[in-house]
A protein has these predicted regions:
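Carbohydrate-associated surface elements
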Residues: 40, 171-174, 194-197
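A short, well-ordered alpha-helix in the C-terminal region of glycosyltransferases
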Residues: 232, 389-402
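N-terminal subdomain of nucleotide-sugar transferases
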Residues: 1-57, 262-265
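Conserved donor-binding/catalytic core segment of Leloir-type glycosyltransferases
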Residues: 237-253, 259-262, 274, 392
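A short helix/loop element that forms part of the nucleotide-sugar donor recognition site in Leloir-type
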Residues: 48-49, 204-236
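Nucleotide-activated donor-binding/catalytic signature segment of Leloir-type glycosyltransferases, i.e.
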Residues: 222, 268, 274-277, 282-309
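Nucleotide-sugar-dependent
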Residues: 14, 253, 304-313, 318-339, ...
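Membrane-proximal helix-turn-helix segments that form the acceptor-binding/catalytic region
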Residues: 112, 116-120, 148-168
Length: 416
């Protein structure tokens, strides 16, 4: 099949690691012809161009800065990107007959691109990978009001995108329930779980023979040595459990609550906290960190993915934070790194997100609401007293059973 994937993510090839690169690599490896449309933000200083890389065709479209920028440029860039993408697709892919039209949110402003592709390819299936429920998430955290013209405009865009989609793949059961409840015009049977997913390296699979046992032991020894090296490299303690948060540091993550949790636990001598990332709220966190230097906390700017993954593997517990005001369920993809590293998790989220409940039900994590610092501290105590290795293994097994690209690939392909 000919497949086109339209995304805001900066993809430079499918041999990278990430939820979209892994999924597109799976489609390629299954024999499909993969075409990806991805932005080149203005800050990178390059023009729109088409390239062939890793056995796929990659169309990089010059846009304004959309991610990790100010609200004005982000908003303008989001409005303009639809036309920029459509013109580029017409120029470079206009002669191709597509069978599957894949696209992800954010943004919700690809409706005309999807409609154009469906007109040109009337037999194609359009499939939305829903990673962001906008504009309701922006209303929830006060970016604009429920009755504002912005919410009215973007809600119309959201509805139009859903109507242009033959199927909507959501990140979790709570996502599915939310979309069905708030969009009754859309056929409920066409909303399904197509979760964030990754490719898992084969060596980490459960051993079945002597040679595999030997390989697994070698892998564990390698990871133990790697952990010592990484902790030395980043000046982290070797004798304490380390709790790590890695990812975006913006308004959706509820950074004020994260800071309150770090403040409440900063004098502990039985554990250590590492925060890695960047975003609009990073300076706020950095200011707090500078005033509390040399305690049991380390704050670091975003690392290259390979370096971050190595750091995560050297830690003991993964942390998830989301703003308590959210009425929409979220499912941050950083969970996958934690589970692949066989780490248990603590999720501090709004009550509508089901990530924490799924973790508790399956024995690989704990959950509290992200407006209760004492409850978070109690979970730190509980985690320190738990069998973290067993919890981490349960998380890894859950990842293998539910969050591999094979799961997402099969979910999409069952419609053909």
């Amino acid at each position: 099949m000919n497949i086109i994937f339209i995304t805001l993510s900066n993809i430079n090839g499918v041999e990278e690691r990430g939820i979209y690169a892994d999924l597109m690599r799976k489609f390629r490896d299954e024999g499909h012809q993969v075409h990806i449309v991805s932005p080149f933000e203005r800050r990178l200083g390059q023009a729109t161009h088409l390239q062939e890389v890793d056995g796929i065709r990659l169309l990089k479209v010059r846009t304004l800065n959309i991610q990790k920028t100010n609200v004005v440029e982000k908003g303008l860039g989001t409005l303009l990107i639809e036309g920029q993408f459509q013109r580029a697709i017409q120029r470079y892919f206009g002669h191709i007959q597509f069978d599957l039209i894949l696209y992800s949110t954010p943004p919700i402003t690809f409706t005309n691109v999807v409609k154009y592709l469906k007109r040109k390819n009337p037999k194609a299936i359009s499939y939305l990978l829903l990673k962001d429920i906008f504009p309701q998430n922006a209303v929830d955290i006060g970016i604009f009001g429920e009755h504002s013209i912005f919410n009215w405009y973007f809600r119309k865009k959201e509805v139009a995108l859903y109507k242009a989609s033959d199927f909507i793949g959501c990140m979790s059961p709570a996502n599915v329930e939310f979309i069905r409840k708030h969009n009754p015009y859309y056929p409920a049977e066409r909303v399904e779980v197509a979760p964030n997913s990754i490719e898992i390296k084969p060596l980490s699979d459960s051993p079945r023979g002597g040679e595999e046992n030997k390989n697994l032991q070698e892998e564990r020894t390698k990871r133990k040595v790697e952990s010592i090296y990484i902790r030395e490299r980043y000046q982290l303690p070797k004798d304490k459990p380390i709790f790590i948060y890695g990812g975006n540091l913006g308004k959706p993550q509820g950074i004020d609550f994260l800071i309150q949790c770090l403040e409440a636990n900063k004098n502990r001598d039985d554990c250590y906290f590492v925060v890695v990332g960047n975003g609009t709220e990073y300076k706020k966190l950095q200011t707090w960190y500078n005033a509390n230097f040399n305690l049991n906390v380390k704050v670091m700017q975003r690392l290259p993915k390979e370096d971050y993954d190595m750091l995560a593997r050297s830690c003991d517990v993964g942390l998830i934070f989301l703003d308590h005001r959210f009425t929409i369920p979220n499912y941050p993809s950083r969970l996958l790194v934690y589970l692949q590293s066989s780490m248990p998790v603590i999720c501090a989220t709004d009550p509508n997100t089901d990530m924490g409940r799924i973790a508790e039900e399956n024995g690989y994590g704990y959950w509290c609401e992200s407006n209760n610092v004492p409850a978070f501290t109690a979970l730190i105590d509980k985690m320190l007293a738990s069998d973290r290795k067993a919890m981490g293994q349960r998380g890894y097994e859950f990842l293998k059973a539910n969050y591999t690209v094979q799961n997402t690939y099969d979910t999409i392909m069952k419609h053909f």
